Curated annotation (Swiss-Prot):
The keyword Ribosomal protein applies. This is Large ribosomal subunit protein bL9. Gene3D superfamilies: Ribosomal protein L9, C-terminal domain (3.10.430.100), Ribosomal protein L9, N-terminal domain (3.40.5.10). One of its GO terms (molecular function) is rRNA binding. One of its GO terms (cellular component) is ribosome. PANTHER family: 50S RIBOSOMAL PROTEIN L9 (PTHR21368).
Amino acid sequence: MAKRVQVALTESIASLGKEGDLVDVAPGYARNFLLPYGKAMNVTPAVLKQIERKKEKEKIAAGKLKQEALDFQTALSTIGRFTIKKQVGEDGVLFGTVTNGDVAEAIEAATKKEIDRRNITVPDIHNLGAFTAKIKLHPEVNAEVNIEVTS
């Protein structure tokens, strides 16, 4: 039976785990690849303490990010409606569509807070009127904003 060696990963490796995980690997894999290339460290009590401290800091930082997202969600709901002006043809149809970038600009103008347009889901909007867009502020926090498209 082959002996296994326990190492702590210093970076994420798809076949083993993510940074900070303790994994059991073959001694040759650890000695010839993981340790020389700095992808893992031998497990010692000091390394275990370091990993634990790092995980605590990450947990606190994740809690702060979630709280910021919840606060921003509340701010978006208090504003109520965002207005986007677009050019309209004679038949009342927009020239082009309202994109997630347009919604991001409207939110940034109203809140002075930058938001990534890739986190905004906008329905196909080709007419004037009121619509709802969904925003992913955090993996656990989503918000819905009302959009009014005017000419």
